[in-house]
């Protein structure tokens, strides 16, 4: 597919199975993901109908799960005790500067988000509360839950453990590389 853009849904976990197929290597039993080798022969091939993503910690605790189909993206935020943006999880960038300049740090996020990626590729309008999208929302919730059960996602059992060796910013911290020990969760380390 030299010089072409391929729009197939793929995830990082799909890279290893793809390499195994391309190199004609046996895939280990424990391997997650689906090979997308077929798209190199047929750019219209769609090896999967949805992909999944998760975050637990970046620089602060912010457990998120997501399922993305060709058209829709469903996001579930699991830390209901903190509904603001976790700005320490946002790298220094023009986007973060914009948030800070416009006092968007206090903006809240919904526990669930649903976006129509065809009509809203910038994900500006959350459709999770729109009655017209409830069937789609329920379908994506079920896809995510089925995936979480199959992969034994620990978030299904409550807040995730923070180990003492983790260096984790407090949720209200603005700068991930802060030198102030007060900006770090006391359950982990700060240096």
Identify the function of each model-found stretch.
Residues 47-53, 162:
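WW-domain-binding short linear motifs
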Residues 16-20, 24, 37, 64, ...:
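Non-transmembrane alpha-helical segments in soluble domains
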Residues 10-17, 31-34, 69, 109-112, ...:
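A structural signal for well-ordered alpha-helical segments within the folded catalytic domains
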Residues 1-30, 34-46, 125:
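Substrate-binding rim/cap in mid-to-C-terminal beta-strand-loop elements of soluble/periplasmic
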Residues 131-167:
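A contiguous, mid-protein "functional segment" used to position or interact
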Residues 22-27, 40-44, 76, 118, ...:
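A generic secondary-structure signal for well-formed alpha-helical elements
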Residues 57-128, 158, 164-170, 178-191:
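C-terminal, low-complexity/hydrophilic appendages and adjacent surface loops
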